[in-house]
Amino acid sequence: MKVKIAAVGRLRAGPEADLVSDYLDRFGKTGRALGLGPVTVHEVEARKGGMAAEGELLGKAVAGSQIVCTLDERGKVLTSPDFANLLGKWRDEGRSEAAFVIGGADGINPALRAQADYSLSFGKMVWPHMLVRVMLAEQLYRAASILAGAPYHRV
């Protein structure tokens, strides 16, 4: 199952970009044997039209994806093993691509949120959208490690 990350804004060179790149590379290597990956990142411009304009661009970026999952403070809070099981379930159902949507500073357009198949939250706190990319990349790698039985995830 391919994975797409559609996000508002450009991730410039720096620690966040380094972390995202590292975790997505790890996910690619670990996930390959599990039928997960590769990951593609589709960045859309932050727009003056706010959420509506960004939502339109994000919607186009994920068109055709079999699963669309928003990352939103109103979403479901999962444990890392539950997230791994969710990815495994989507893969086992034969879904060819799961797309994760990260909104801009104002969040995700309500119309796009309503169309999503799933909504995920990294907790009740609000996170900067650039940090959410790092957190998602790490959780994708952690999920692949859990599914592979690798020792990365310890409890």
Where are these regions (language model features)?
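S-adenosyl-L-methionine/SAH cofactor-binding core of RNA-modifying enzymes
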Residues: R32-A98
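Structured adenosyl-cofactor binding patch, chiefly the S-adenosyl-L-methionine
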Residues: D106-R154
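Short hydrophobic segments within beta-strands
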Residues: A6-V8, H42-V44, V101
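Conserved RecA-like P-loop NTPase ATPase core
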Residues: I5, C69, G103, L136
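N-terminal beta1-alpha1 ligand-phosphate binding loop
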Residues: M1-G31
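Short glycine-rich anion-binding loops that position phosphate/pyrophosphate groups of nucleotides
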Residues: L11, E73-K76, G104-G107
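Short glycine-/acidic-enriched loop or helix-start segments at secondary-structure transitions
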Residues: P15-A17, T79-P81, P110-L112
